[in-house]
Amino acid sequence: MSTADHSTINSACTSTSGKDQSYLLKLCGSHKVSYQPNSDWDCYVDDAQKPIDMDLILPHYRARYQPINHRMNMFVGTEAGPVKLKICRSFSRSKFYLEVQASMSDVTLYLPSDFKGRIHHVGKAKFSSGFVNRVMQNVYFTDSDDEGSESEDCVVVVTNGTIMFRMWDVQTCAPENPQKETFKRMFGCSKKAPETTIDWDFLLEG
């Protein structure tokens, strides 16, 4: 995976045609991610100033001519606006690679509850109760931006702002319920989070 050209200030996703063309994406709302055989990125969003608040919906099927071991590759970049992304997945075999370059912006990521793979981040990270309860046990944090194996999920986040990791529930197809997950955490109804070597704060939500 080559590093995206961060000097590009637009919001675009490469089309599947053989022509060198793109179509604009809305920076808010839902977007269905689809296999793009002629691009390094299956979804590419880069905007200098505007806030980004998107639900990226991963496919529940393999597209025609899509390699069996292909990970959906997504890039989101901004220079100043806050970033909020929900990675929505209903089929756990649809693995993904997500890279977020956010300069000084705060980033909120909702990762699917069946996430399994690695996370590399530059910036102070916080974790919601839902993330700790349902996701943390299947995550290992790395000091490098190695993309890892195609058979696992991978997230890379670089920002000088704050990163908030939250959980998107694959069973309810909705973001975590903060009150419910906080009660689970308080009364010990969830598995203990593994120790990590990173500096993180536990977020108690009311």
Predicted regions and their residues:
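Intrinsically disordered, low-complexity terminal regions
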Residues: 1-206
